[in-house]
Amino acid sequence: MTPPRPPSGRVRSLRDYSSESEKMDGTGSWDTLEWTKLDSTSGSGSFSNLSCLLESERVIVEGYGVVLINTDEAGTLLVTNFRILFLSEGTRKVIPLGTIPLATIEKFNKMVLKVQSSPRQSDKIPPRRLLQVTGKDMRIIVYGFRPRTKQRRNVFDALLKCTKPERVWDLYTFACGPSKFGNANPKERLLNEYFRLLGKSSIRASMDMIEDGAFTLSNELWRISDLNSNYNLCQTYPFAFMIPKSISDAELLQACSFRARCRLPVITWCQPGSGAVIARSSQPLVGLMMNMRSNLDEKLVAAFCSQLPGAKGERRKLYIADARPRKNALANGAMGGGSESSSNYFQSEIVFFGIDNIHAMRESFSRVRDYLDMHGTTSSDGRSSFLRHGGWTWGGGNLSSMSASVSLLGDSGWLIHIQSVLAGAAWIAARVAMESASVLVHCSDGWDRTTQLVSLACLLLDPYYRTFAGFQALVEKDWLAFGHPFSDRVGMPNISGSGNFDFPRQSSSAGSFPSSPVRQSSGSAASQSSSSSHGHNNYSPIFMQWIDSVSQLMRMYPCAFEFSPTFLVDFMDCLLSCRFGNFLCNSEKEREQCGIADACGCLWAYLTDLRSFSATSHVHCNPFYDPLKYDGPLLPPAASLAPTLWPQFHLRWACPEEAKAADIGVQCRAMTVKYSEMQKEKEAAERRVDEISFAMESLSAELLRERHLSWVARESANRATKEYAALTRAVQSLGCKINFTTSDVEDDPRSSLENNPRRRNRHGNNSDVSVSISLMPEENTSGNPKGRVCEALCPLRTREGVCRWPEVGCAHVGSQFVGLKANFDAFDRLAIYDSYFQPK
């Protein structure tokens, strides 16, 4: 079915009508268009064969004549089982800003904008129907729909259904399946990382090893335990973890009860050579009075203080880093939690990092997103920040307005939180690298702030984690295996079938549209209905905050990472979209119960496949990477930890041009690609020059051969001419005459070879020539012997055959042969005897 088109040719956008409204005192509106009375209620099949559709992606609802308010583009909106797809009206190209995966949507609202009518207008202008979609990837999108249709309602209902799957199996990734991006068992990769940390990289894990329980390797200090192979010890811990070799499994069973959710202290990274470790756990259950103790927990923690190498009996220091603010740790004591006391733990020191909880991070993220939308070039109200509040904020507005705009970013607190995470991780890395101390990190549950700190510290300490393979190993170990609740934090359904969703379907509360698509003087906005993807209040961008922190380190050390900021952006987009199964559910146990590894595609395999076609020239590769220079720990000083907005992620929707300009790697890569193309063109030109040179040499050699053959031919012709002349004179001296005749021309005594060269040439080329020698008549020789002799022998005669004697001297005058007549019959009468030839 052909989508309906307005008679005017192009669907006019909201900005067109808002400008007309200003010119005509509010008389213009979308109603000026004669819309076709066709309301698409479901997928009609006209877009089922789009090349942009992914595997197993199908169109559910279509909306025609939709306007993307952010960029004032008209097009077609499609809701599929994977995403909202916005296609430009003319070319049907995908508009990236208007295209967003369903799982990436944080919330969406139906908005109604009431436009005031002009006094000169008799008809009432219908309200403009808008749909605002807020993404988890820092963008706010607003779509404008045609009036007097049910398109917005159909799209809204489809989003309610598709963004609220009842079970995790209803996600698109299960419909797509593993495809060509199969997922190897993550347990094998986790064991391989443990083997590397233990110094046994030559051993490779296998499923047979896991099934037989033959993976419990060890070195002098640490060992791998299989106590949690059935997840009976701790449901949110991996099936295997590293602990001190001196601690038995029986002691672990007793010690785990003293930690929240049984997340006992285990090793997440150990430094080769020195024996220093970074350990992680949840908070201890010390109680309100902070007087509860566990001897086995204290013994386990003390085992991290192994003996220093080269020191006689001296053991290393232990730092216990509590990621929470001190007051929060004390408040947790009222619920049975709390923090350790340095007097109870051997050679330890307690440090509080003061990082806020998930709720503060969620609020901060929302504020910085609103700031970017309000002051970006592609705002959700369709206007630039230059025209905010009806005036030129930067060009001629008042100074207080400018200051207020700038302060909004600081008020969001996002950069302050990033700095807290960076400072904490840098402090941990410095203690391990400079003091060879061990550090135990925990927060409340040990899966949010703890994971941020230990993984970022490992990234600073171990250069392996700054490669593609190492980054994957780090994320799978510290984030996935140790149970960061991705389902809760990203806002996805979990294994129990109840996701973190709360959709009030009939909430008709009036509200203020954060960024009105037209000037507030032209009308008012109201929220008719809204939806949210984190009703249970567990949604929080914890992992995104960590990725942001990694990008800050890449800004400080641009040559220390194999991957580029673009890789982090694409990696984050894949995670939020739920296109792959790696980050589904809340723990390793839940992913195993769902069969994620077998049923879904692998994000890592997909990213590796993208790079396989371009090798080091791919946008995911860092062109400045120098592994030889940065082969040790990175220890940034405190002054360098001041963060900035991450342009490639934060600004890509609000300020796309500025985001591209900020990526030096992209510019360098473009120059590299251009240089590579020019190098290829140069090589092709050089090959062409070589071919032409070879051809010229061949032609020159051929020309030399031809010249040689020509010279030989000329010499042969000259020699033949001389021989012919000599033979002619000899024959004529005997009184004979040479005649040339052909088979088709009668003999002509006047056509001798020397007297008619043109005929000679014709005979030589076109006729069969016969040569005859005849005797000259006697009367011709007896009458004028001198003339005969001169005619035959004298080289001084003229071309006409006239003798030039006596003007010139003649060697033949007076010769004894003048007038000599040859008698050939006498030769026949000669008697020749054989005895003449006998030897004497």
Curated annotation (Swiss-Prot):
Myotubularin phosphatase domain: residues covered: 199-650
Family, similarity comment: Belongs to the protein-tyrosine phosphatase family. Non-receptor class myotubularin subfamily.
Keyword Hydrolase carried by entry: yes
GRAM domain location: 45-112
Tissue specificity as recorded in UniProt: Mostly expressed in siliques and leaves (including hydathodes), and, to a lower extent, in flowers and roots.
UniProt-annotated catalytic positions: C443 (phosphocysteine intermediate)
Keyword Coiled coil in record: yes
Major site of localization recorded for this protein: cytoplasm
Domain of life the protein comes from: Eukaryota
EC number: 3.1.3.95, 3.1.3.64
Positions annotated to bind substrate: N332, G333, A334, M335, N357, I358, C443, S444, D445, G446, W447, D448, R449, R489
Null allele phenotype: No visible phenotype in normal conditions. Impaired accumulation of PtdIns5P in response to stress such as dehydration, leading to an increased resistance.
Protein name: Phosphatidylinositol-3-phosphatase myotubularin-1
Expression triggers: Accumulates upon dehydration.
Cell compartment(s), UniProt: Cytoplasm; Endosome membrane
Pfam families named among the record's database cross-references: Myotub-related
Region (Disordered): 1-28, 506-535, 745-771
UniProtKB keywords: Coiled coil, Cytoplasm, Endosome, Hydrolase, Lipid metabolism, Membrane, Protein phosphatase
GO biological process terms held by the UniProt record: cellular response to water deprivation; intracellular signal transduction; lipid metabolic process; regulation of response to water deprivation
Biased amino acid composition, Low complexity: 507-535
PROSITE patterns: PPASE_MYOTUBULARIN (PS51339), TYR_PHOSPHATASE_1 (PS00383)
Record function comment: Phosphatase with phosphoinositide 3'-phosphatase activity that can use phosphatidylinositol-3-phosphate (PtdIns3P) and phosphatidylinositol-3,5-diphosphate (PtdIns3,5P(2)) as substrates and produces phosphatidylinositol-5-phosphate (PtdIns5P); participates in pathway(s) that transfer gene regulatory signals to the nucleus. Required for recovery after water deprivation, via the accumulation of PtdIns5P upon dehydration; high PtdIns5P levels mediate ATX1 cytoplasmic localization, thus down-regulating the expression of ATX1-dependent genes. Confers sensitivity to soil-water-deficit stress.
